[in-house]
UniProtKB/Swiss-Prot annotation:
Keywords assigned by UniProt, alphabetized: Hydrolase, Iron, Metal-binding, Nucleotide-binding
Alphabetized GO MF terms: hydrolase activity; metal ion binding; nucleotide binding
PROSITE patterns, alphabetized: HD
Protein name per its UniProtKB record: Bis(5'-nucleosyl)-tetraphosphatase, symmetrical
Entry binding sites for Fe cation: 21, 50-51, 127
Family: Belongs to the Ap4A hydrolase YqeK family.
Chain positions recorded as ADP binding sites: 21, 51-54, 83, 109-110, 127, 133, 170-175
Native source organism of the sequence: Bacillus subtilis (strain 168)
Residues in HD domain copies: 18-132
Primary enzyme class: hydrolase
Enzymatic reactions: P(1),P(4)-bis(5'-adenosyl) tetraphosphate + H2O = 2 ADP + 2 H(+)
């Protein structure tokens, strides 16, 4: 699937605002992939499809999580996390993407995971720093991403955890595990 086909496919699933975000993530992911030695074509496709399920009804996502035996603890956390694993599932079935590297980059772009691949890190950080994002801490992560993808990832996860904690919201366990894995030098 080429860029134009992928963008046309995903555009049907997104609002105009989210589509603009997706194009920003795509361009940022390609840039990061080239900078840090990841496969830029895989980064392009993963970035295009990363929010494919973002606007699916919560009930549909819940059913997919249960039916496909995705980790049950997903349902105990913010539904904003669900679109990543559900998106990987739907992109495979509806868009025909079969590459596991791409599907994993989509699957873990909201939570991270210990043992993240370079491509997964690229998509996570690209989603966080794409040019249309404007929130406290994003410029610091952009600066880190110029030279050190791991430090950019660590800082983005720290920022996310602090944001959630300040709002007395739970942090998804996989995100804590990812942070610990990263700072332990793994």
């Amino acid at each position: 699937m080429n860029r134009e086909e992928a963008l046309a496919c995903v555009k049907q699933q997104l609002t105009e605002h989210r589509y603009i975000h997706t194009v920003g993530v795509m361009n940022t992911a390609i840039e990061l992939a080239e900078r840090f030695g990841a496969d830029s074509k895989k980064a392009e496709i993963a970035a295009i499809f990363h929010d494919y399920a973002k606007f699916r009804p919560k009930e549909e996502m819940k059913q997919i999580i249960a039916r496909e035996k995705m980790p049950a603890h997903l349902l105990d956390h913010n539904p904003e996390l669900w679109h990543a694993p559900v998106g990987a599932y739907l992109v495979q079935r509806e868009a025909g993407v079969q590459d596991e590297d791409i599907l994993d980059a989509i699957r873990y772009h909201t939570s991270g995971r210990p043992g993240m691949t370079l491509l997964e890190k690229v998509i996570y950080v690209a989603d966080y720093i794409e040019p249309n994002r404007a929130f406290p801490g994003v410029d610091e992560v952009r600066k880190l991403a110029e030279t050190d993808l791991n430090q950019a990832l660590i800082q983005s996860i720290k920022n996310t955890m602090v944001f959630l904690m300040k709002k007395n919201q739970p942090v998804f366990p996989d995100t804590f595990l990812t942070y610990n894995w990263l700072v332990s030098g793994s």
